[in-house]
Amino acid sequence: MSVAGAANAAPRFKGPVEATVLSVVDGDTFLAEAAIWPGQYIRVNIRVRGIDAPEMKARCPAERDAALDARALLAELLGEAPVSLSNIAGAKYFGRVLADVTTSDGTLVADAMIGSRAVRPYRGGRREGWCG
């Protein structure tokens, strides 16, 4: 990587960081309290890396229904136990972070959500719509 490329690369924190899920926003985002240092916690929205979920502010009834289903599935997967965050970086719209999320039983959240077909794989770029 060139010096310019290295300077412009988004910083990432390898982790893992333990986090307690406080609420689920939608099918790919949740609010968590993350333990960043002993006795130090932050509340932050976490976007699950590698997935695209239907939007809660939907363009059609089918997308809204799919968004509610995806949110319910994410809440079920995350459960009550702490989760582990790794490969942590600022998301496109900073104010939330992008991370790989693993449940307490070792389930990779993105893989489980994609396997359920409630969400689509996402690697950046333009996303497909959910209404057509």
What positions do the PLM features span?
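Small beta-barrel nucleic-acid-binding modules, primarily SNase/OB-fold domains
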Residues: S2-G132
